[in-house]
């Protein structure tokens, strides 16, 4: 997220951007997808998602969506071309990171200062000078999220984090060597023989080849199963230690192969995770400006949370949500005549509306998933 924000702000004459990265080698290979609404050119094409189309229309005014689309038109062509390419299908995360990093370095007329350092919250506060703007893109374990509430240091827990644990699950990912689609009916019929564990897939093409499909399957597990599993493993380990869980996965794969005569490319990648839905109650340092005392740096300099630092959902990859928040924030920052209090208010409202969208979408996906998991259960 920090790379995208840097690329968005880099060409703005009023900013001198300093990007801090924990590391410069991009090793995260998991497949992600940039949603098509990020490159939409009309309100109609923006509101095309079959799950949250109505939610978007209920939460956001048409004028808000139109303003976001207008900012997209100002995004430099070199960056927009990349976004359109990634929106074609799933892409390795580190390929996106490397592409953005190379783009930043290639813009010789607008150099960015880059530092590799493990920055702490105390470091971030100490380096803030009057006139600086600090943007936290450090992810779900945000560096500054719980520092945005005055007095948070004296409070146990996470005072600025609201979290709902929906369930525990296995997330199974693999590439399949044929174009494939799986709607709700497909998910239903492919799980009829699975008595307990259901394999609920999401399928889409890869961005580089429309004939290769990326499959992400979620299998709900118990808290006891979760504790007995390592954090990451492969299909062989699952079949050896949890054969009943593996059966649901293997049945799905076998039926897909039977229909299309394709094969899995490479290995299965499986992780076990708690599926948490969360948000920051305050997405900026506005509360410090309202109620803070003394000479705290967050009173002098604004702080914003972007991406997973601000909110996250387990059922769909949050890179698109983070990218959209980054675009909205960049659009605010380039407005020279926008007073800082108004900027903070507008970003807080936007973050809350995005949270409503995320919450409703996540609950709908969970509802649909729970219904599919009742397949074959004559008691439910």
Each predicted region: which residue ranges?
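Active-site-adjacent segment of FAD-dependent monooxygenases/related oxidoreductases
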Residues: 15-18, 22-109, 362, 366, ...
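FAD-binding beta-loop-beta segment adjacent to the flavin cofactor pocket
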Residues: 271-316, 338-341
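C-terminal helical "tail/cap" subdomain of flavin- and related membrane-associated enzymes
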Residues: 43, 316, 331-380
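N-terminal Rossmann-like FAD-binding beta1-loop-alpha1 element of flavoenzymes
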Residues: 1-20
């Amino acid at each position: 997220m920090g790379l995208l924000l840097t690329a968005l702000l880099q060409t703005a004459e009023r900013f001198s951007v300093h990007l801090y990265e924990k590391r410069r080698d991009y090793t995260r290979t998991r497949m992600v997808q940039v949603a098509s609404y990020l490159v939409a050119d009309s309100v109609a094409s923006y509101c095309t998602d079959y799950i949250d189309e109505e939610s978007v229309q209920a939460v956001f005014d048409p004028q808000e969506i139109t303003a976001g689309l207008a900012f997209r038109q100002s995004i430099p062509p070199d960056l927009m071309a990349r976004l359109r390419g990634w929106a074609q299908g799933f892409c390795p995360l580190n390929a996106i990171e490397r592409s953005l990093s190379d783009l930043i370095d290639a813009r010789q007329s607008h150099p960015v200062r880059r530092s590799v350092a493990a920055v702490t919250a105390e470091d971030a506060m100490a380096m803030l000078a009057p006139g600086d703007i600090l943007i936290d893109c450090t992810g779900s374990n945000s560096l500054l999220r719980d520092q945005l509430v005055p007095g948070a240091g004296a409070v146990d827990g996470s005072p600025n984090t609201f979290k709902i644990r929906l369930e525990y699950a296995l997330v199974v990912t693999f590439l399949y060597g044929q174009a494939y689609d799986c709607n709700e009916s497909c998910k239903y019929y492919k799980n009829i023989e699975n008595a307990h564990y259901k394999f609920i897939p999401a399928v889409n093409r890869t961005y580089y080849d429309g004939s290769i499909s990326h499959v992400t399957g979620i299998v709900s597990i118990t808290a006891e199963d979760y504790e007995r599993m390592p954090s990451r493993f492969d299909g062989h380990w699952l079949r050896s230690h949890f054969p009943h869980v593996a059966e649901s996965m293997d049945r799905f794969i076998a039926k897909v192969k039977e229909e299309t005569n394709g094969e899995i490319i490479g290995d299965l990648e499986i992780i076990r995770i708690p599926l948490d839905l969360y948000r920051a109650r305050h997405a900026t340092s506005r509360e410090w400006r309202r109620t803070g005392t003394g000479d705290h740096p967050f009173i002098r300099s604004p702080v914003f949370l972007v991406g997973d630092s601000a909110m996250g959902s387990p059922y769909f990859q949050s890179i698109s949500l983070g990218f959209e928040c980054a675009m909205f924030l960049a659009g605010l920052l380039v407005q020279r005549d926008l007073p800082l209090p108004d900027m903070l208010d507008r970003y807080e409202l936007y973050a809350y509306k995005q949270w409503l969208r995320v919450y409703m979408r996540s609950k709908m996906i969970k509802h649909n998933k729970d219904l599919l998991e009742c397949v074959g259960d004559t008691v439910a």
